[in-house]
Every structure is written in C-alpha cells, then in structure tokens.
Amino acid sequence: MSEAKRLAAEKAIDYVEDGMIVGVGTGSTVAYFIDALGRIGHRIKGAVSSSEQSTARLRQHGIEVLDLNHTGTLSLYVDGADECDPNRCLIKGGGAALTREKIIAEASERFICIVDPSKQVPVLGNFPLPVEVIPMARSLVARQILALTGGQPVWRDGVVTDNGNVVLDVHNLHITDPVALERNLNQIPGVVCVGLFARRPADVVIVGGETPRVL
C-alpha cells in the first residue's frame, strides 16, 4: 500500500498553486506529500503543520512552518484518513493529531484527503474512533461514551497528544449518522475533539493507485 499512498500524495501536488500557504496534516501518507512538496518548496510561501512530527519533516525540506494565528484562512489543506465513507466523511486521529488537524481543516477553503484504497469503507466505524480528552476526565468520558454509543472506549495508554491530552479509541461502532455522532460526542464535558470529520468533511478525496482516482 505504500506505493498507493505515494501516488495519492503526488496527485495532491496538482492542487498546490504558486504563493500558497499549505495546511499539512499528519501520518504516513502525508509524509509522502511533504516529500513531494519539498521539491516545489520554492514556489510556496510556507506551511501550517498539524503536528510536531510533520513540522520536523517540513523543516528538513527547508519549508517555513507558520503559525495559523498569523496566516488567516488557508487556501488548501492536505491530510490523510484512517477511514473514508462515500460522503467523504472521515475517521482521523490514528496518529493522535486530530485536534490540530480539525482546526486546520476548519481554517481551510479546500480540504484534500489522500488515502490508499484500503481506507475506503461503506460505513465508518471499523477503525476505532479516536477521541482526545482532558486527562482528569478520561474515566468520566469513557463511561459517557459507552452509555451514548454502546461502543467500547479503550485508553491509548502511554500516548500524550501535542496538546498534553490523552486519547480514547472507541471500538465496535457502526456510524450511520456521523454528523450527529460528532455533535453528540463533542457535548460530553472533557472531550477536546472527536476524530470524526463529518460536519466538515473532505472536499476532494484522492485514492492512490496506478491511476489515482479523484472523488
């Protein structure tokens, strides 16, 4: 699947225009995009990064990493996904960067999601849904998620997000209404961010392959 990821990432470069500040996500597919972006780094003004991991890789390529507070609205955000449904709703957060990813997606006019074919699903939920949580609320949030969804929340032990929080991965979900679930989970006190990108789905999904498909 690594070749499919690379091909999806290379196709996303077609959406990068001269003078842009590019929002950049996190993960193995995005790493290929950053490498491709490095080849045209002289054409862009810089990037806004969703994680320390991506920031380090961008800087290795000599791309300036900018503060979103100083850039205003971004023209383009490119990121991967753990799952993608036919409506371009996503599960994201396997790399624990979901909060910053969601902030940058919200701040961007266009959100391009790059995936390999294994990430396409008819219904979201086979991949455990990440939820970023304030540490003191971990048990409270887990109980409320169980009561609300019937899914099984599992603490991702040993993982601390770039924001200093913890992650619960919710297993055994069958998400037929991702917009409603995103809204309801966000209302639980202690939840920082839910790894459902449904209220703000991707605008374009690029599925890697010998001939990448654009959805």
Swiss-Prot record:
<dbReference type="Pfam" id="PF06026">
    <property type="entry name" value="Rib_5-P_isom_A"/>
</dbReference>
<comment type="subunit">
    <text>Homodimer.</text>
</comment>
<feature type="binding site">
    <location>
        <position position="119"/>
    </location>
    <ligand>
        <name>substrate</name>
    </ligand>
</feature>
<feature type="binding site">
    <location>
        <begin position="92"/>
        <end position="95"/>
    </location>
    <ligand>
        <name>substrate</name>
    </ligand>
</feature>
<comment type="pathway">
    <text>Carbohydrate degradation; pentose phosphate pathway; D-ribose 5-phosphate from D-ribulose 5-phosphate (non-oxidative stage): step 1/1.</text>
</comment>
<dbReference type="GO" id="GO:0005829">
    <property type="term" value="C:cytosol"/>
</dbReference>
<keyword id="KW-0413">Isomerase</keyword>
<dbReference type="GO" id="GO:0009052">
    <property type="term" value="P:pentose-phosphate shunt, non-oxidative branch"/>
</dbReference>
<dbReference type="InterPro" id="IPR004788">
    <property type="entry name" value="Ribose5P_isomerase_type_A"/>
</dbReference>
<dbReference type="InterPro" id="IPR020672">
    <property type="entry name" value="Ribose5P_isomerase_typA_subgr"/>
</dbReference>
<comment type="similarity">
    <text>Belongs to the ribose 5-phosphate isomerase family.</text>
</comment>
<dbReference type="GO" id="GO:0006014">
    <property type="term" value="P:D-ribose metabolic process"/>
</dbReference>
<dbReference type="GO" id="GO:0004751">
    <property type="term" value="F:ribose-5-phosphate isomerase activity"/>
</dbReference>
<protein>
    <recommendedName>
        <fullName>Ribose-5-phosphate isomerase A</fullName>
        <ecNumber>5.3.1.6</ecNumber>
    </recommendedName>
</protein>
<feature type="binding site">
    <location>
        <begin position="79"/>
        <end position="82"/>
    </location>
    <ligand>
        <name>substrate</name>
    </ligand>
</feature>
<comment type="function">
    <text>Catalyzes the reversible conversion of ribose-5-phosphate to ribulose 5-phosphate.</text>
</comment>
<feature type="active site" description="Proton acceptor">
    <location>
        <position position="101"/>
    </location>
</feature>
<dbReference type="InterPro" id="IPR037171">
    <property type="entry name" value="NagB/RpiA_transferase-like"/>
</dbReference>
<feature type="binding site">
    <location>
        <begin position="26"/>
        <end position="29"/>
    </location>
    <ligand>
        <name>substrate</name>
    </ligand>
</feature>
